[in-house]
Design a protein with these regions (language model features):
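Long, contiguous binding/interaction regions
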Residues: 1-161
């Protein structure tokens, strides 16, 4: 069973393409739509999508103009940035911005096709300087200060046992 990576994504561009992506996301086949692999194969999925399976639990909102979609979902083990890259290669008129947080494996990051940005950061709450290398926007967006406080409480409880 995988750790689940939480993802938040904004996709912008042609309204017809956004509608097609929306339909795929609601059918739990977003990644197959963005970067088709046909019959599922573990190695092909990881190489093409960056994750083992397609997404689960999508929450989709479309802006009124139909050209922007906001999407939250979980993916297995890590974010599907490879699928984003493959989609953008074939659809340069579209843009994808994403951020993600995987609490079990302790990493966070973001992707932005317009800025050619794809960065991941390790989270080590045991290091008092854990914030130093992580952009503040990511810390705020994913509530890492609260996560850190919860971690400290858990550590205190462990020490009391």
């Amino acid at each position: 069973m995988p750790n689940w990576c939480m993802n938040t994504v904004t996709i912008t561009g042609d309204a017809n393409k956004v509608a097609a992506i929306e339909a795929a996301a609601k059918n739990d086949s977003l990644l197959e739509h963005l970067a088709p692999i046909g019959e599922w194969d573990y190695g092909t999925a990881v190489e093409t999508w960056g994750t083992k399976w397609d997404i689960i639990g999508p929450d989709v909102q479309i802006e009124e103009d139909g050209k922007t979609m906001h999407l939250n979902f979980d993916s297995a083990w890590g974010p599907p940035t490879e699928a984003y890259e493959k989609y953008i290669e074939k659809n340069p008129d579209m843009s994808i911005e994403a951020s993600y947080y995987e609490s079990g494996m302790c990493f966070i990051g973001w992707y932005n096709s317009s800025e050619e940005l794809n960065e991941s950061f390790e989270i080590d709450f045991a290091d008092e300087d854990w914030r130093d290398d992580i952009p503040q926007d990511l810390i705020d967006d994913w509530g890492l200060d609260d996560e850190y406080e919860n971690w400290k409480e858990w550590q205190d409880d462990e020490d009391d046992d």
